[in-house]
Amino acid sequence: LELVSSGEKWGRGPAKDIHSSLKAMVDSPAWHLVKALNTLVSEDGNEIAIDGYAKPRPITAEEKKMIADASKVRSEAQAKKQLSVQHWIGDLPWEEANVRLESQPTANIEGLVGGYTGPGGKTVLPHKAVAKMDFRLVPDMKAADVVPAITAHLAKRGFGDIEVNMSGGYDPTQTAASAPLIQAQISVLKRAGVDPVMWPRSAGSYPGFVFTGEPLKLASGHFGLGHGSGAHAPDEYYVIESTNPKIQGYDGAVMSFVEYLYELGK
């Protein structure tokens, strides 16, 4: 999503960039956006506070056990090192942080754009400011409900001029671990000497709903041998040729899909 604050649409503040000394007598669209953003979340920025926003489906006891088992296998210290973080939200213990990762929607600011962002300073009062945001959804939330909820929430608080532009999005997706598709994946991985760690959901997003949602209602899941990490980061990587016999390279990853298709055909 894009949330856009402009002096022209607001009817206050400048319709073009002006000298910052004039802030003494002219409203700021940038500050207007900051104040609007602040209403969307709790004081610490970690809980969504949008009026009428859909609540996530509670995770089941089976899903909680899956998370607990996975948390025992995955190293918390390694995860923090990989992500370059020192604390989880609210200093949650490892298992509870993973429960939150698997069960809670998010309101994330990807970037803020407005005015001068080059080296040094420039005394300017920007006429427009933009917040790039993403809202991760979890079952049973709907992408179509997000923009109307945000728009109504902002209007109720005097921010009806803020544009809420949806550039893309889709519904959440989930497939049960008991599905034949997932069981076929597990069989192939175990034959390759891998004891898979099972999570109820992928923390990231992909348009799996086109398969798992109406009208198809099919299973969908991620699969493949090989190794990569750092998704969407500057140092994202994937192993093409492996020097570790326990890790497949690109060729081994491709062949794992051949084995997978054979397993599905049984």
What is each of the regions a protein language model found here?
Residues F135-V138, E163-S178, R201-A203, P207:
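A short beta-alpha structural unit
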Residues G114-A149:
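C-terminal catalytic subdomain
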Residues A149-I162, M166-Y170, G204, G226-S229:
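Active/binding-pocket-proximal capping segment
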